[in-house]
Amino acid sequence: MNNLIMLVTNAVTLSEAAGGLFDFNATLPLQALQFILLTVLLTFIFYKPIGKLLEERETFISNNLAEASAKLLKADELCEQYETQLKEAKTGAQDVIAKAESEAKGIVAQEITQARADAASLIAQTNKELEAQKKLALQQLETQIDELSQLIKEKLLGKVVL
């Protein structure tokens, strides 16, 4: 290792002495070796860990996106199911309401029919009572007329007439 450092320092001093930017002497292969060594070191120390991190992050993001899209699909399915159930519930409720309305109309019609029948029987009974009272009143009037005519006869004739 010390030999390598000495070679590098010697090469640097030689290149300074020559004064050229690219001297094609021993420094060029040394610089190429340094570049390759730097590239290998950076690859293992820097690029591979960062590449792993980027790959892990990309995997994490893609997994989260896949999971989110799966959950979104499931949510859409649940939403469709709930909408279907809601439509069925509304239809069922409308059926129940229609049935209740028809039952209520039937009950009202039955009550009206019953009330009319009760009213008709009450009218018939009242008519019978009125007829009975009329007959009674006529009988009482006839009795009173007979009594009055008897009184008139007695007053006119002066005695009791049978």
Swiss-Prot record:
<keyword id="KW-0813">Transport</keyword>
<dbReference type="InterPro" id="IPR050059">
    <property type="entry name" value="ATP_synthase_B_chain"/>
</dbReference>
<comment type="similarity">
    <text>Belongs to the ATPase B chain family.</text>
</comment>
<keyword id="KW-0066">ATP synthesis</keyword>
<keyword id="KW-0406">Ion transport</keyword>
<comment type="function">
    <text>Component of the F(0) channel, it forms part of the peripheral stalk, linking F(1) to F(0). The b'-subunit is a diverged and duplicated form of b found in plants and photosynthetic bacteria.</text>
</comment>
<dbReference type="GO" id="GO:0045259">
    <property type="term" value="C:proton-transporting ATP synthase complex"/>
</dbReference>
<keyword id="KW-0138">CF(0)</keyword>
<dbReference type="InterPro" id="IPR005864">
    <property type="entry name" value="ATP_synth_F0_bsu_bac"/>
</dbReference>
<keyword id="KW-0793">Thylakoid</keyword>
<keyword id="KW-0812">Transmembrane</keyword>
<keyword id="KW-0375">Hydrogen ion transport</keyword>
<dbReference type="GO" id="GO:0046961">
    <property type="term" value="F:proton-transporting ATPase activity, rotational mechanism"/>
</dbReference>
<keyword id="KW-0934">Plastid</keyword>
<protein>
    <recommendedName>
        <fullName>ATP synthase subunit b', chloroplastic</fullName>
    </recommendedName>
</protein>
<dbReference type="Pfam" id="PF00430">
    <property type="entry name" value="ATP-synt_B"/>
</dbReference>
<comment type="function">
    <text>F(1)F(0) ATP synthase produces ATP from ADP in the presence of a proton or sodium gradient. F-type ATPases consist of two structural domains, F(1) containing the extramembraneous catalytic core and F(0) containing the membrane proton channel, linked together by a central stalk and a peripheral stalk. During catalysis, ATP synthesis in the catalytic domain of F(1) is coupled via a rotary mechanism of the central stalk subunits to proton translocation.</text>
</comment>
<keyword id="KW-1133">Transmembrane helix</keyword>
<comment type="subunit">
    <text>F-type ATPases have 2 components, F(1) - the catalytic core - and F(0) - the membrane proton channel. F(1) has five subunits: alpha(3), beta(3), gamma(1), delta(1), epsilon(1). F(0) has four main subunits: a(1), b(1), b'(1) and c(10-14). The alpha and beta chains form an alternating ring which encloses part of the gamma chain. F(1) is attached to F(0) by a central stalk formed by the gamma and epsilon chains, while a peripheral stalk is formed by the delta, b and b' chains.</text>
</comment>
<keyword id="KW-0150">Chloroplast</keyword>
<dbReference type="GO" id="GO:0046933">
    <property type="term" value="F:proton-transporting ATP synthase activity, rotational mechanism"/>
</dbReference>
<dbReference type="InterPro" id="IPR002146">
    <property type="entry name" value="ATP_synth_b/b'su_bac/chlpt"/>
</dbReference>
<keyword id="KW-0472">Membrane</keyword>
<dbReference type="InterPro" id="IPR028987">
    <property type="entry name" value="ATP_synth_B-like_membr_sf"/>
</dbReference>
<feature type="transmembrane region" description="Helical">
    <location>
        <begin position="26"/>
        <end position="46"/>
    </location>
</feature>
<dbReference type="InterPro" id="IPR034679">
    <property type="entry name" value="ATP_synth_b"/>
</dbReference>
<dbReference type="GO" id="GO:0009535">
    <property type="term" value="C:chloroplast thylakoid membrane"/>
</dbReference>
